[in-house]
């Protein structure tokens, strides 16, 4: 055989050998491999009594014991007041949501937007509007639903949450963020924490307040009981929501009581407003909800003058009259005759509880006596002194005394915290990178009902074997190409 033929034959032999080795390497030690789970997204609108916010959540498409490991990736506060304030302009409620939806669409990948479950949950503000005028409430919901459907999302509906749902979803949020429901272990797995007590949740909104906790006794009133199954574990909770006891509605009820106690005179002396503070309001600004019905003899346009007297001794007495503290025999109560077992364990107080106490620098686990003294000291300051000290807070400055004393009355006389259990209350707005509220708990509970996606299953190799197989394939290709080139272009002598 001439020399050219020998070289070409050798190269072809090498090509065959390299190919066989590559084939063997690609066939041995093949393992089943699961690709990392994809990511799902969800949107929840929190349509509160004072404002609306949109939260964007994500979680792995596979789940841990049936519940998603959810994280907050974006939030957006809608401009303007809550959707209940659009009772006379329903279209405005829908239009107000669009800028936040645009922001959410920039976060969620385009290919996943159409399968993103989207919800709007309304709380006490819409509960009150529904009581006041159900037709207007339906019109507002129709317009916000229409606006959301203009976006490429899987809109699942707008609804009014019950008070118990609002409270219990807030409880889920608190305990999820503080890792009492599930925790990532050193072994690299999500596990249910052992010997960890769950936390209670205290929520104060504009129109309602909620208390939720796991009591140490059997819950006697099933109307205040809720059961959740999360991450494979059952939780039996006490929860109750008090409508009209949110900070805004309670303040209106207090103003109405002072007006009525003064025989409906045009000048109202307010012991909870700073001395020297003066404000002109109308009857309609006080008596504008089912919490504060308008007496028939009053004209909504009538002008009233409110003058602060700065009396922190008289203020709690006036606030306490808003609560009915009587209770039936042989049972424990919160207030208004509602059954409540004794408070137990640690509590997180958020929303209105946090905002007011944060302004007063009372979120640092101070004693009840210290909190009382601080609030009283603030209430004793006159209006000019407060404006000089806090010029940037002038719009809401007159409310901090009344809300501070209201919170104290609610927690101590209403929910029955005392000097010993007060230290168990933690005032907070966030935990980790997420806001504390009902929306995250709502989404966590919702993922129980969203089907799990099976992990994609493929065949895989050890990286070293895969690299070896690729190397021999490359060598086989090179040897084959050289053989072809020699055969075509090497001229025999």
Curated annotation (Swiss-Prot):
EC annotation from Swiss-Prot or TrEMBL: 3.6.1.5
Pfam family of the protein (one): GDA1_CD39
GO cellular component: plasma membrane
Catalytic reaction annotation: a ribonucleoside 5'-triphosphate + 2 H2O = a ribonucleoside 5'-phosphate + 2 phosphate + 2 H(+)
Glycan attachment residues as annotated in the record: 65, 79, 133, 223, 234, 267, 324, 330, 361, 372, 382, 445
Record bears the keyword Cytoplasm: no
Protein topology in the membrane: Multi-pass membrane protein
The UniProt record lists the keyword RNA-binding: no
Transmembrane segments: 8-28, 464-486
Listed cofactors: Ca(2+); Mg(2+)
Gene Ontology MF annotations: apyrase activity; ATP binding; GDP phosphatase activity; metal ion binding; ribonucleoside triphosphate phosphatase activity; UDP phosphatase activity
Enzyme active site: 166
Cofactor binding description: Ca(2+) or Mg(2+). Has lower efficiency with Mg(2+).
GO BP: nucleoside diphosphate catabolic process
Disulfide bond entries: 76-100, 244-291, 327-333, 379-401
UniProt topological domain (Cytoplasmic) ranges: 1-7, 487-493
Xref: Gene3D superfamilies: 3.30.420.40, Exopolyphosphatase. Domain 2
Localization: Cell membrane
Keywords attached to this entry: ATP-binding, Calcium, Cell membrane, Disulfide bond, Glycoprotein, Hydrolase, Magnesium, Membrane, Metal-binding, Nucleotide-binding, Transmembrane, Transmembrane helix
Post-translational modification comment from the UniProt entry: N-glycosylated.
Enzyme class name: hydrolase
Residue ranges, Extracellular side: 29-463
Similarity annotation: Belongs to the GDA1/CD39 NTPase family.
PANTHER family noted in UniProt: ADENOSINE/GUANOSINE DIPHOSPHATASE, ECTONUCLEOSIDE TRIPHOSPHATE DIPHOSPHOHYDROLASE 8
Reported function: Canalicular ectonucleoside NTPDase responsible for the main hepatic NTPDase activity. Ectonucleoside ATPases catalyze the hydrolysis of gamma- and beta-phosphate residues of nucleotides, playing a central role in concentration of extracellular nucleotides.
Protein name: Ectonucleoside triphosphate diphosphohydrolase 8
Organism, scientific name: Gallus gallus (Chicken)
Gene that this sequence comes from: ENTPD8
